[in-house]
Amino acid sequence: MLLARMNPQVQPENNGADTGPEQPLRARKTAELLVVKERNGVQCLLAPRDGDAQPRETWGKKIDFLLSVVGFAVDLANVWRFPYLCYKNGGGAFLIPYTLFLIIAGMPLFYMELALGQYNREGAATVWKICPFFKGVGYAVILIALYVGFYYNVIIAWSLYYLFSSFTLNLPWTDCGHTWNSPNCTDPKLLNGSVLGNHTKYSKYKFTPAAEFYERGVLHLHESSGIHDIGLPQWQLLLCLMVVVIVLYFSLWKGVKTSGKVVWITATLPYFVLFVLLVHGVTLPGASNGINAYLHIDFYRLKEATVWIDAATQIFFSLGAGFGVLIAFASYNKFDNNCYRDALLTSSINCITSFVSGFAIFSILGYMAHEHKVNIEDVATEGAGLVFILYPEAISTLSGSTFWAVVFFVMLLALGLDSSMGGMEAVITGLADDFQVLKRHRKLFTFGVTFSTFLLALFCITKGGIYVLTLLDTFAAGTSILFAVLMEAIGVSWFYGVDRFSNDIQQMMGFRPGLYWRLCWKFVSPAFLLFVVVVSIINFKPLTYDDYIFPPWANWVGWGIALSSMVLVPIYVIYKFLSTQGSLWERLAYGITPENEHHLVAQRDIRQFQLQHWLAI
């Protein structure tokens, strides 16, 4: 992958990717031999590139971009994780650290990635022409996005399987008596607080029809003894996975021109469904108890470090910074697009969606607690157990249960598809911008990316596939993505320079970011990311799935997966340093100087070697 050898002499780039600063707002003449531009008082002569005759494609409409960003950021975690975290960590009090981290870290990082992609008009790898040593960060986030595609599509396939299973008069997770049920299967109507006892929460009870349908009917987990015994792929999930991958391919094969139209459905449909579920949910008996539990305010919980840690990690993963998606999406914007307004709007929509979804979730949980005569805490849970066990079970008791099941799983399907589309686009754009042969064969390359995710996802749809999925979900995009974004923030804010980055934004939109944003980029956001990275390592616990404890070798494999992306950062620095001609001083200078300023190295005029560069804000 690391094929390009840098020449220290000043040569025009010829990678075919159109960049913002070299595409002025006025129409350019293709016959020009030289373009003179000024950046930070330094005039650079830039030879026009071969790709200038074919300018970079842009979104068909501005709304296509906004819906794509919202669709990517608003995913399954908004439904199955945030509401439970809010409930668990003091209810309304949790919104204080959550909002604080949104303002001082989430939004600044979101804004930074959009501006970075829009100005340079490059994917996650080639955007690092601003600081060549950091190109390994781009490769790292591309690999992480690919890893996520291996297992995230499987969760979408589960949703599709549930959707197909919902087209029956009697939902299959309503009662016992099916081939997948165990002798211990218990009618939910017979379960209450006295039957369960004091030590068993309803959400953890494994013998309800809904729980057995998920673990035995869908996953076939009972046929596997652990991660060492995964078995063969299940044909039902195989077909669903094929459908998901085919939909993804035809959504992405022509770039943003097709994906920008698909998100009109996948990004908006969940809001209609969420509204319908919310309106119906609040009318159910016990719903008010669930909502009160969700919104209860316990300020004393703010004294606990875990509350702040949960808020920090949730805001980071919720916004989706660091996967290369925001950079890729923004690279197809018009150069003068107001990405500042876009960042504020889309990040706010994402967080508001998380909060509102809690009402739809906890109204149903309150209803379940009322029906089974247990406390809210006995039914409250997060993750797959919420959306594939508890919520479907609650739906099965409603009048017109088939309709509500179809509506709910259509929402999950839409939430998953546009998020997966974003991850795949990050991989495709990131590599296609780096290797022009891939860009020239976009359709074939898109097929290769989607098909590779299909092949490796086969391990996750085996009888023990949930163990593989849990391993990937924990390690593939955990500490590694936090590390990658930390490096990204340092590369932009310190090596490239906040002042220079602010000037780039001024060229695009006509105004410089305020002091608040510059301080966040240079100090607050890197400190926030460093804090989250350290906490994620300190709080690591050996991997488990319910009562199953993963063997030690599985944890080592997991850390190997995590390190496989992180090591790309130092490996590329070493590669770039060794492959560059010149003295040690010149090699270092070329590695930290933007490519369009390499002529300054010969003049020994390097910003990064001056104290003023590091102190500038």
Swiss-Prot record:
Changing G149A: Decreased norepinephrine uptake. Changing K135A: Decreased homodimerization and norepinephrine transport. Disulfide bonds join C176-C185. Its main location: membrane. Changing N153A: Abolishes norepinephrine uptake. One of its GO terms (molecular function) is actin binding. Changing C44A: Decreased protein levels. Decreased dopamine uptake. Na(+) 1 binds at G71, V74, D418, S419. Coiled coil: none annotated. It is a multi-pass membrane protein. Residues 1-62, 117-135, 255-257, 333-338, 429-443, 493-522, 570-617 are cytoplasmic. Changing F435A: Decreased homodimerization and norepinephrine transport. Changing F459A: Decreased homodimerization and norepinephrine transport. The keyword Phosphoprotein does not apply. One of its GO terms (biological process) is response to xenobiotic stimulus. It catalyses: (R)-noradrenaline(out) + chloride(out) + Na(+)(out) = (R)-noradrenaline(in) + chloride(in) + Na(+)(in); dopamine(out) + chloride(out) + Na(+)(out) = dopamine(in) + chloride(in) + Na(+)(in); dopamine(out) + chloride(out) + 2 Na(+)(out) = dopamine(in) + chloride(in) + 2 Na(+)(in). Pfam families: SNF. (R)-noradrenaline 1 binds at D75, A145, G149, F317. The chain crosses the membrane at residues 63-88, 93-116, 136-166, 234-254, 258-282, 307-332, 339-362, 403-428, 444-464, 466-492, 523-545, 549-569. Belongs to the sodium:neurotransmitter symporter (SNF) (TC 2.A.22) family. SLC6A2 subfamily. This is Sodium-dependent noradrenaline transporter. It comes from Homo sapiens. The lineage of its organism: Eukaryota, Metazoa, Chordata, Craniata, Vertebrata. The gene is SLC6A2.
